[in-house]
């Protein structure tokens, strides 16, 4: 039987030739010796003939970080590794030189090879070996067996490391003594050959700025060690003398910039080296290096940086008078860096009464420093941007109060001066009985009018200090209506609603049918509230639409004479704004659910137009979570609030989910679901709402697009960020982020990243990590909310059902609110 073998065709031959040409070119470029084989990552030299006489280096003498392994064996003519030879291979990790003629390793041989992890120098001609080539390397293995070491002090360092079990495995290393006797290295004894020691004269170096100090370093060891000082980043002038023992270091005119630096004394001989260190503490007078006008964050903050040692005491002054701090206005130190303190004066909901000059005084026993900054938080009422005031009714009497106690930082408002009609003198005792009766009747009627007219004016009543200082809000949600499904819709069009800082078009979802005014529920009836039944107490905040006040509302509920409410005003009196106002009121009237903030009605008697919502005692959920988290002790004074339990977190989460189920059933898309837009009432009752104020209070949560639009991108899915597409599925994504907020006690999502970095992470498919206190079942639920494709996300009803089941499995105790 004849077998046929196909001969290589010309194409295959050409390919093989090309490969050989490429390999040959690379080999030539590297300068690979004849006894070596070279690749892009490895050099292998094991052929004894013709052999190599020096360590292989690249022909172009440029650094190469691709080669990670060099293996050399059977090279009897290779006797040394010199400076700058191995240094060309900066990426080298493994070096093997075995069964060769190696006699010498330069002390600078591996100075550039910081990645070296493994060195094997076995079976060579090494009679001595210094420690210096290896002291800066983080080696996992250094193998030195079967070398003709000579018993001397120079190899004592190898014994010391063997004794301290520096290597993963003990090695049988031998040396030859003066009698040509071969002994184990571990049994080697060399007189006057010890590891040196070093001791500083002072380990608590303290000096006043501008003074001088001298430090001594006493060393011992055999052979006598060389001494050096390590003075990294030392700014002050200094002199050292290491020619005698003890060595000395004198620092002159010490600078405060050197406070906190470490000063080290190093003693080194051929056995090894030791280092001892002490921290330099410089005492100096305070210096306020930075102070700036207030910036809005979660609270208003006047930022500052103060240097000083000992730690300066800080005192604030307002308009020249001492500012007594309280829970509403206090100094917070955020970062301490040696003797540098970064912090701010934090003000909770300041008003125009807090405008003025603030002076910071920093003082310690070495001196003091002060800096002043002007602060403007709010315009004075009555200048066109203040709250609604009837000048004929109210007289504002401002008393210079202690601004530190914000519960007393309100205008003292006098009640209307009710003038009682003076009693008319009797002209004669003979006035007819009929006229007397008529006068009495008139007086009775006047008294009745005065009695029931006391609440007939819409304005602020009484000092605001009697009301809780919590911020609370609720707001319109967004119904999916017919119109353009692009963000380029006319801002002033009929489908635009006021959202925080701007008007944003209502986005159409083609899966739903739109709803117009004619399609509202037939029984839709917006309750109208008389203006004289609304009495403002204090301002809660301000959005683009206008201001929000805490108020008392009379005759709203049959069972109560008056109740606390949140009042939202409309400052824009244009026709379009009024149309939006009425349309919004009709939509809100249809939202009736136990976990949606209740809308009571409107007041349209005169200007401004007013919406009335229920008031939630404990404010927004984000502040509530922070106040009941592990970091609450950093923010609170006095008793620390009780920390939320896992079951209470689940109870909160399932209430929010219940509210979102209802909104989805009504074809509403929230578009700004976050803990800052949820409110907390009695017995851990949580409701969804939003006055739009959160864009002012939580400004860092929003990303400004163009000149006006602010988007909560940390809560938005990819399709909303990239295409401005808002649907029930995008609300599901936001609900997952809300769950993450709850189980982190109110942390900001992606708090470690800038807004641009957050956009990049979300659009690239990254998700938030599992919170430390979060059960796996809840995190799996979060991941179900964060699927990139909207149709792959969990259904809102599924989420509510899962949270309900988890909450039922863990009973809730509601005494957290006291």
From Swiss-Prot:
Membrane-spanning ranges: 427-450
Q: Which UniProt keywords apply?
A: ATP-binding, Cell membrane, Cell projection, Cytoplasm, Developmental protein, Differentiation, Disulfide bond, Endosome, Glycoprotein, Immunoglobulin domain, Kinase, Leucine-rich repeat, Membrane, Neurogenesis, Nucleotide-binding, Phosphoprotein, Receptor, Repeat, Signal, Synapse, Transferase, Transmembrane, Transmembrane helix, Tyrosine-protein kinase
Q: Which gene encodes it?
A: NTRK2
Protein's UniProt name = BDNF/NT-3 growth factors receptor
Q: Where are the LRR repeats?
A: 71-92, 95-116
Q: Which residues are glycosylated?
A: 66, 94, 120, 199, 204, 226, 253, 287, 324, 337, 408
Asked whether the keyword Translocase is assigned, the reply is no
What is this enzyme's catalytic activity, as reactions? L-tyrosyl-[protein] + ATP = O-phospho-L-tyrosyl-[protein] + ADP + H(+)
One GO CC term of this entry?
axon terminus
| Molecular function via GO | ATP binding; brain-derived neurotrophic factor binding; brain-derived neurotrophic factor receptor activity; GPI-linked ephrin receptor activity; neurotrophin binding; protein homodimerization activity; voltage-gated monoatomic ion channel activity
Annotated source species = Gallus gallus (Chicken)
Listed GO biological process terms: brain-derived neurotrophic factor receptor signaling pathway; cell surface receptor protein tyrosine kinase signaling pathway; cellular response to brain-derived neurotrophic factor stimulus; central nervous system neuron development; cerebral cortex development; collateral sprouting; learning; negative regulation of neuron apoptotic process
Site annotation (Interaction with SHC1) points to 512
Q: How is its activity regulated?
A: The neuronal activity and the influx of calcium positively regulate the kinase activity and the internalization of the receptor which are both important for active signaling. Regulated by NGFR that may control the internalization of the receptor. NGFR may also stimulate the activation by BDNF compared to NTF3 and NTF4. The formation of active receptors dimers able to fully transduce the ligand-mediated signal, may be negatively regulated by the formation of inactive heterodimers with the non-catalytic isoforms.
> What cystine pairs are annotated?
32-38, 36-45, 151-175, 153-193, 217-265, 301-344
């Amino acid at each position: 039987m004849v077998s046929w073998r196909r001969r290589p065709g010309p194409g295959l031959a050409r390919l093989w030739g090309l490969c050989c040409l490429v390999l040959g070119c690379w080999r030539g470029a590297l300068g690979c010796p004849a006894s070596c084989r070279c690749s892009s990552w490895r050099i292998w030299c094991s052929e004894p003939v013709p052999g190599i006489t020096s360590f292989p280096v690249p022909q172009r003498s440029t650094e190469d970080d691709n080669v990670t392994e060099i293996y050399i064996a059977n090279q009897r003519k290779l006797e040394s590794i010199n400076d700058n030879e191995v240094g060309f291979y900066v990426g080298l990790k493994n070096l093997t030189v075995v069964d060769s003629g190696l006699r010498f390793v330069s002390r600078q041989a591996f100075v550039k090879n910081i990645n070296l992890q493994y060195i094997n120098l076995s079976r060579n001609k090494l009679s001595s070996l210094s420690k210096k080539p290896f002291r800066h390397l983080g080696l996992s293995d250094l193998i030195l067996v079967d070398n003709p070491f000579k018993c001397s002090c120079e190899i004592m360092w190898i014994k010391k490391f063997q004794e301290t079990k520096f290597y993963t495995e003990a090695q049988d290393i031998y040396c030859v003594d003066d009698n040509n006797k071969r002994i184990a290295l571990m049994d080697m004894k060399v007189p006057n050959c010890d590891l040196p020691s070093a001791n500083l004269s002072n380990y608590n170096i303290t000096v006043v700025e501008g003074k001088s100090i001298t430090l001594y370093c006493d060393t011992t060891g055999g052979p006598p060690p060389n001494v050096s000082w390590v003075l990294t980043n030392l700014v002050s002038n200094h002199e050292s003398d290491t020619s005698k023992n003890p060595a000395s270091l004198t620092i002159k005119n010490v600078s405060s910039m050197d406070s906190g630096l470490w000063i080290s004394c190093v003693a080194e001989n051929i056995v090894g080296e030791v280092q001892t260190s002490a921290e330099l503490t410089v005492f100096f007078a305070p210096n306020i290096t930075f102070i700036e006008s207030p910036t809005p964050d979660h609270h208003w903050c006047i930022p500052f940086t103060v240097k000083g040692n000992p730690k300066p005491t800080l005192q604030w002054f307002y308009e020249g008078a001492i500012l007594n701090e309280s829970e509403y206005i206090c100094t917070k130190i955020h970062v301490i860096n040696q003797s540098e303190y970064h912090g701010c004066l934090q003000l909770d909901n300041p008003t125009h009464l807090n405008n003025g000059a603030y002076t910071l005084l920093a003082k310690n026993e070495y001196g003091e420093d002060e800096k002043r900054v002007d602060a403007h938080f709010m315009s004075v009422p009555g200048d066109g941007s203040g709250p609604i005031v009837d000048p004929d009714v109210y007289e504002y009497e401002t008393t210079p109060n202690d601004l530190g106690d914000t519960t007393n930082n309100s205008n003292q408002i006098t009640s209307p001066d009710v003038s009682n009609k003076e009693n008319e003198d009797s002209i004669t005792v003979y006035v007819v009985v009929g006229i007397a009766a008529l006068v009495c009747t008139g007086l009775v009627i006047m008294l009745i009018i005065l009695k029931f007219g006391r609440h007939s004016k819409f304005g602020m009543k009484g000092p605001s200090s009697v009301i809780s200082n919590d911020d609370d809000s609720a707001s319109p949600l967004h119904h999916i209506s017919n119109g353009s499904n692009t963000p380029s819709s006319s801002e002033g069009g009929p489908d635009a609603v006021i959202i925080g800082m701007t008007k944003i078009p209502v986005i159409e979802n083609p899966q739903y049918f739109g709803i117009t005014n004619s399609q509202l529920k037939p029984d839709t009836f917006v309750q109208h509230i008389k203006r004289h039944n609304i009495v403002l107490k204090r301002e809660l905040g301000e959005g683009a639409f206008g201001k929000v006040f805490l108020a008392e509302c009379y005759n709203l509920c049959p069972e109560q004479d008056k109740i606390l409410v949140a009042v939202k005003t409309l400052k824009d009196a244009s026709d379009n704004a009024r149309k939006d106002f009425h349309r919004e009121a009709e939509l809100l009237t249809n939202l009736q659910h136990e976990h949606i903030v209740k809308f009571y009605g409107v007041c349209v008697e005169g200007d401004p137009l007013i919406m009335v919502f229920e008031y939630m005692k404990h404010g927004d959920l984000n502040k509530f979570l922070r106040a009941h988290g592990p970091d609450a002790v950093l923010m609170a004074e006095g008793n620390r609030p009780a920390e939320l339990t896992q079951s209470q977190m689940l109870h909160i989460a399932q209430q929010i989910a219940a509210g979102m189920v209802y909104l989805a059933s009504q074809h509403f898309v929230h578009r700004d679901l976050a803990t800052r837009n949820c409110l907390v009432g009695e017995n851990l009752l949580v409701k969804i709402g939003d006055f739009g104020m959160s864009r002012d209070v939580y400004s860092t949560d929003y990303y400004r697009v163009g000149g006006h639009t602010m988007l909560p991108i940390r809560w938005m899915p990819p399709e909303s960020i990239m295409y401005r597409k808002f649907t029930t599925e995008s609300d599901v994504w936001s609900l997952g982020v809300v769950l993450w907020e709850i189980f982190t006690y109110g942390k900001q999502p992606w708090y470690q990243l800038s807004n641009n970095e957050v956009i990049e992470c979300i659009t690239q498919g990254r998700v938030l990590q599992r919170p430390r206190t979060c059960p796996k079942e809840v995190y799996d639920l979060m991941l179900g909310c964060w699927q990139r494709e909207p149709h792959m996300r969990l259904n809102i009803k599924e989420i509510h059902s899962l949270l309900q089941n988890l909450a039922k499995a863990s009973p809730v105790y509601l005494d957290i609110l006291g």
